[in-house]
């Protein structure tokens, strides 16, 4: 696992994979720093390929102060750049969660929630 650090000022439109850019993972508090895990990007690309539709990132990286302000867990993986809340238009969240749960990565570690 490698977590890369990006700057919204310098890297906002930088592609981190074929279908994702830095700005999609940016914190809602408009902070400059964005942390993104390379494994997370790989997983999101697999999800996109599986469902054949774009993946929308509702929440990616969260600065610690923003995470506190929204009542997030003090140990939130979002603050480490290793988590994302996503939706796919026309796909029930439970289907996304079940697909993720079937991946070897999540059979070893990690957590999946849906709402």
Q: Where are the regions a protein language model picked out?
A:
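Extended, low-complexity, intrinsically disordered C-terminal regulatory tails
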Residues: 41-71
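Catalytic cores and adjacent binding grooves of peptidoglycan-active enzymes
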Residues: 75, 80-115
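Extracytoplasmic cell-surface/polysaccharide-interacting catalytic and binding patches
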Residues: 1-50
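Generic structural signal for short, solvent-exposed loop/turn connectors between secondary structure elements
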Residues: 32, 52-53, 72, 88-92
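N-terminal start-of-chain detector that recognizes signal peptides
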Residues: 29-30, 55-61, 93-100
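Intrinsically disordered, low-complexity segments enriched in small/polar residues
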Residues: 4, 21, 59, 64, ...
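Amphipathic alpha-helical interface surfaces
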Residues: 36-43, 53, 66, 82, ...
């Amino acid at each position: 696992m490698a977590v890369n650090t990006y700057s919204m000022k310098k890297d906002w439109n930088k592609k981190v994979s074929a279908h994702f850019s830095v700005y999609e993972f940016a914190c809602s508090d408009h902070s400059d720093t964005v942390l993104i895990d390379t494994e997370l990007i790989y997983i999101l690309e697999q999800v996109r390929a599986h469902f054949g539709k774009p993946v929308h990132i509702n929440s990616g990286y969260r600065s610690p102060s923003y995470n506190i302000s929204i009542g997030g867990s003090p140990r939130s993986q979002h603050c480490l750049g290793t988590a994302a809340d996503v939706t796919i238009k026309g796909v029930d969240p439970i289907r996304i969660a079940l697909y993720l749960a079937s991946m070897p990565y999540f059979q070893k570690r990690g957590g999946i929630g849906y709402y």
